[in-house]
Amino acid sequence: EIFQYEQYFHTGRLPLAHDASLDDLAGYLRRAAKAPGSMAVGRAYGQTDLTWLSASASVSEPFRRNRLFRGDMRLDERIYTQNLFVSPCVERSIVDKVFDRGADFYYFNLHGSDAPTACSFYASYQQQCYEAVTPRQLASAEKPNVVVTEACYGGKFQDYGRGETMLLAAMGDMTLLYLGSSRIAWGASKSSSAADLDNADRLTNVYMAKLLEGYTAGEAFYMARQRFFDYNDGYFTPHQALTIVEFNLFGDPFLHVGVRREGAKAHPRAVKALAKGAVNAVVERKCVR
């Protein structure tokens, strides 16, 4: 029933490596202070597993609506289609050639893993696993940025050193906001529009849309979780409930992207919301083993 009430305080986590020092905390605070309440966003980079291309195109629709994709159609469609880079065609050996270091918003719909030495994001094809993007790429970003990932364990950081996971590499360098799951994430491979998204796909789509509408990161995350009340008369499936509790916002929850829209504010939602229609009931794990 928490979403019946207005949330006056929004929280974000600050992940610290096991070998972190006060300088790491101070470094993030200095970078956040340079973006006093707002950071400009002008270019987005998206990368997806081939299996999830349809869903990823729907999730990333807010980028197209705000004209944030570069749209380089000269690339082979096996590598780049629907404004997204596609893995496993884009994998470790070539990702440096396409990864946009000058972007300020990154979206990844790839696999993750809880294996201690598996710290990248991965693509899966014919029962083979391919390293799609590594912590080194995120650490090479040149501008203050936002990262959103649907990967399983995309938000893992405990017992790792500086830069050893995607989260620590990003937040230890130029990333100010990071949204990711601490455990298994669930999503679907097919989608015809944002209306039929569910689980991690819906959460990330709404979060990115609300950020780009001018809400703070904390408000956008709260509203993304609220959105699950739009279906099934306010009752959750097990996967929806897991999505709500396992995704975490890292960074300053009071930061917002671009110009804050007049009157933008998160409001409480009635628990018994009218169902708007069926959602995609097929769910898949976003993990590799």
Predicted regions and their residues:
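Cysteine-dependent hydrolase recognition
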Residues: 1-289
